[in-house]
């Protein structure tokens, strides 16, 4: 068994990131589902869909949910699903997702930490020299 991965984002952002990560890695080693939330959708209906995905993905080791924007509808849906077998990380980016997919044998807690680190480490500013 391994941790399941549920990606909840605005529109097709999650699907696009997952497709790109699979091309980069050549595989998707975790059981993964994406849920794209349309802009004008009913959050309660989307919560039901997310719960269905969660049931499919939970195989005993937990589920990691990645969302794109803290405080948004996808993030709010994910926060309602959080429990002792479900971890939620916001701020999804491609480096975070690739990091998660690179460690399919980690525990839920370890994978959540890898996700957070991968997301942070993937942000590298290239700033112009400060004016003198």
Model regions: which residues?
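N-terminal loops that bind phosphate or other acidic moieties
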Residues: 2-64, 69-132
């Amino acid at each position: 068994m391994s941790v399941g991965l549920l990606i909840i984002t605005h529109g097709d952002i999650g699907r696009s990131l997952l497709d790109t990560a699979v091309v980069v890695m050549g595989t998707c080693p975790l059981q993964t589902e994406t849920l794209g939330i349309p802009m004008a959708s009913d959050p309660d209906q989307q919560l039901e869909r997310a719960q269905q995905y969660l049931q499919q993905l939970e195989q005993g080791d937990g589920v990691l949910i990645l969302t794109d924007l803290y405080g948004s509808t996808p993030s709010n849906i994910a926060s309602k699903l959080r429990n002792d077998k479900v971890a939620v990380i916001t701020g999804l980016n491609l480096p975070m997702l690739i990091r998660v997919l690179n460690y399919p044998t980690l525990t839920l807690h370890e994978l959540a930490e890898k996700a957070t680190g991968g997301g942070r480490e993937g942000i590298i500013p290239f700033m112009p020299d400060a004016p003198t």
